[in-house]
Swiss-Prot record:
Organism listed in the record: Escherichia coli O6:H1 (strain CFT073 / ATCC 700928 / UPEC)
Any single GO BP term: L-histidine biosynthetic process
Coiled coil: none
Descriptive protein name: Histidinol dehydrogenase
EC number: 1.1.1.23
Residue sites binding NAD(+) per the record: Y130, Q188, N211
Catalytic activity, as annotated: L-histidinol + 2 NAD(+) + H2O = L-histidine + 2 NADH + 3 H(+)
Gene3D superfamilies on file: 1.20.5.1300, Nitrogenase molybdenum iron protein domain
Lineage: Bacteria, Pseudomonadati, Pseudomonadota, Gammaproteobacteria, Enterobacterales
UniProt keyword NADP, yes or no: no
InterPro entries given in the database record: Ald_DH/histidinol_DH (IPR016161), Histidinol_DH_CS (IPR001692), Histidinol_DH_monofunct (IPR022695), Hstdl_DH (IPR012131)
Similarity section: Belongs to the histidinol dehydrogenase family.
Pathway named in the protein's UniProt entry: Amino-acid biosynthesis; L-histidine biosynthesis; L-histidine from 5-phospho-alpha-D-ribose 1-diphosphate: step 9/9
């Protein structure tokens, strides 16, 4: 089924509807799983030596110094245009503003007289950021990860990227307060961050996107007792657009293509109650596609994408919630009114003037989002991902005395005698003091 095929949702059977919302299959092959496991064990055992060998093998680069020097970062900064630096500064300011606003006030309540309960927040002590290399370096992801890490107060923030590291990535790291940058890519970088080597410090939590090997490495280290936590499960990028008859077809098409050009496994979906709008968007996609440098990649993504005509906007919202897109764009005349009905989406973009690109780069929201249906249970990345919550309780003698019989009754009902004794001993001590 080509992207130009317009599908009438209500003419489909329940099984056909289910198939229409299926995502491109992702699974780590046995060979990837084994290869990654071997890389993890090798890096854990041999440290820096293994990292250099993998750089020569996979990146075709001889790495002498794994850590990027301050002079190299300064030189990279000099090579960038003032225009790009200014654009990064604007983006960082907006990201800072939005993520600073996410700080939670401390909770401090008396649940009953003499029983004080608190919730306090602490930063994750050390975090590692992974930034892919390649022809289009994702320096914007540095801004999205390092900025909230700094606001959260993480004491150690380090970054790994395949050599040679792009000037934009090095400058973004410096701009956002990353302390150390390392010439390490792939699954071996995840291993280095999870276990530590002579040069790369072990971190508590790893953030950032990557290829199938990086994704599998993150999964494996997150399940090892000697590994590290990770940000969220990863999957192909996706966007769903809800458009009414008043939407601009060229705008809708550009948003669909901005997602499709990410990779051949990306998925884009248009939901509209207007069949003419669907046709006009399909035509606009073809026109714009012809001008794109990454047209072949986008075409592959469009093979798994859909143009769906619905009964009305309410049905569009219902289908969107069922799919749970990473990015949801609502280009309707009543976009704000539809938000309360949205239950599953990574990030929502309202109206004609809120392209996905705004959130990808500079509006202030984070572009690290749950995908592949994980929006049903996972949140978009935010300040909380770089923090942990801790509870505190303090009972006075009076508070303890009042609550003691309740605790004893509950502990006895669960047959946890030591729990009950911890209370009874104190009750008896208070009686002796009286």
């Amino acid at each position: 089924m080509s992207f130009n095929t317009i599908i009438d949702w209500n003419s489909c059977t329940a099984e056909q509807q289910r198939q229409l919302l299926m995502r491109p299959a992702i699974s780590a092959s046995e060979s990837i799983t084994r290869t990654v496991n071997d890389i993890l064990d090798n890096v854990k055992t041999r440290g820096d030596e293994a990292l250099r060998e993998y750089s020569a093998k996979f990146d075709k680069t001889t790495v002498t110094a794994l850590k990027v020097s301050a002079d190299e970062i300064a030189a990279a900064s000099e090579r960038l245009s003032d225009e790009l630096k200014q654009a990064m500064a604007v983006a960082v300011k907006n990201i800072e503003t939005f993520h600073t606003a996410q700080k939670l006030p401390p909770v401090d309540v008396e649940t009953q007289p003499g029983v004080r309960c608190q919730q306090v927040t602490r930063p994750v002590a050390s975090v590692g950021l992974y930034i892919p290399g390649g022809s289009a370096p994702l320096f914007s992801t540095v801004l999205m990860l390092a900025t909230p890490a700094r606001i959260a107060g993480c004491k150690k923030v380090v970054l790994c990227s395949p050599p040679p590291i792009a000037d934009e990535i090095l400058y973004a790291a410096q701009l956002c307060g990353v302390q150390d940058v390392f010439n390490v890519g792939g699954a071996q970088a995840i291993a280095a961050l999870a276990f530590g080597t002579e040069s790369v410090p072990k971190v508590d939590k790893i953030f950032g996107p990557g290829n199938a090997f990086v994704t599998e490495a993150k999964r494996q280290v997150s399940q090892r007792l000697d590994g590290a936590a990770i940000d969220m499960p990863a999957g192909p990028s996706e966007v769903l657009v809800i458009a009414d008859s008043g939407a601009t077809p060229d705008f809708v098409a550009s948003d669909l293509l901005s997602q499709a050009e990410h990779g051949p496994d990306s998925q884009v979906i248009l939901l509209t109650p207007d069949a003419d709008m669907a046709r006009r968007v399909a035509e606009a996609v073809e026109r714009q596609l012809a001008e794109l440098p990454r047209a072949e990649t986008a075409r592959q993504a469009l093979n798994a994408s859909r143009l769906i005509v619905t009964k009305d906007l309410a049905q569009c919202v219902e289908i969107s919630n069922q799919y749970g897109p990473e990015h949801l764009i609502i280009q309707t005349r009543n976009a704000r009114e539809l938000v309360d009905g949205i239950t599953s989406a990574g990030s929502v973009f309202l109206g004609d003037w809120s392209p996905e690109s705004a959130g990808d780069y500079a509006s202030g929201t984070n572009h690290v989002l749950p995908t592949y249906g994980y929006t049903a249970t996972c949140s978009s990345l935010g300040l909380a991902d770089f923090q942990k919550r801790m509870t505190v309780q303090e009972l006075s003698k009076e508070g303890f005395s009042t609550l003691a019989s309740t605790i004893e009754t509950l502990a006895a009902a669960e047959r946890l005698t030591a729990h009950k004794n911890a209370v009874t001993l104190r009750v008896n001590a208070l009686k002796e003091q009286a």
